[in-house]
Amino acid sequence: MRSQLLRHGVRTAAVAALAFATTVGGASGATAQRHGTSPIDVTVNASGIKAPHHHEGGRVAFRVSTDAKDGRQLQVVRPHKGVPIRRVLRDLADAVSHTPSRAAAGMRAFEADAEAVGGAFVTRKVHEEFTTSIPDGTVYLIDFTAFLERPTKPVVKSLKLYGSHDGHHKELTRSPHSTVTFRDTDAGPRFRTEGLVTSHKPILIRNASSEVHEAQIQRVAAGTTDRDLRKYFDAMAQGKKAKSPFTGQPVGFGGISPGHKALLRIHGLKPGTYALTCYVPDEHSGLPHVFMGMYKIVHLR
């Protein structure tokens, strides 16, 4: 779900929200503790993904960090019952194609074969924790940054989730939180935010749309408006050069499938002006959703 390639001038689905892999293997825990779970500590960097091999299912909390200079993205996927991971990976390989029609077909195939259950964009200074409901079974942790850098040797690690005592249908939070909802509109996919005004408040991510979406949060120059973002992304979509409004590395939440939700806590995010964006390819056009208007300026104090 990384957008580095787009920002370097590559169009369409090369900046897809989901990575793929061909080889299986190799802060504060307050949010997880409030939900009665112990967090899964995940470190992702140039050496690979460090995480346990198994953990209790149900309400699962991932605590993600990196020491990589340019930051890292972790994406978690769960194949549907009976679907081999290699088939899912082939779907995702298509989803990150430079050809829009192939990218769209890849996203449709992925959504038929698996679920995106969340992810995290992290940097040296910003780590994250997200809690979501995942039933028993195997999920796969993917380093999407590694995929962009070396697509022939992507990195993925399996994680076996086993029976939970408290189930996986309980509410994620009873405490105050901000909300970011992904929704469909006549104009295309959009963000709806409620209470997203502080940099330290937990964020409830809800996918109420019909496709996979993400919520990147990236610092922009003070005074940047939604109109400025539209001009920038319109130029990029047309293959034109444009001055980037971004002044920092992306953080935020990775891809999540329709009907899913997660509670995200970002540690180390500074107050300021940020752009909320989604680069996941559309399942019909194959273009990143951000080219279709899925962006929004937010001011965090």
Regions found by a protein language model. Give the residues of each.
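Generic recognition of flexible, low-complexity loop/linker segments
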Residues: 191-192, 203
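Contiguous segments within soluble domain cores/interaction surfaces
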Residues: 66-98, 200, 206-236
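N-terminal, intrinsically disordered, basic low-complexity segments enriched in Arg/Pro/Ser/Thr
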Residues: 34-36
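Secretory targeting and sorting signals
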Residues: 1-32
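Extracellular/periplasmic metallocenter environments
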Residues: 38-57, 61-77, 112-188, 194-198, ...
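Non-catalytic alpha-helical scaffold/packing segments enriched in small hydrophobic residues
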Residues: 204-205, 268
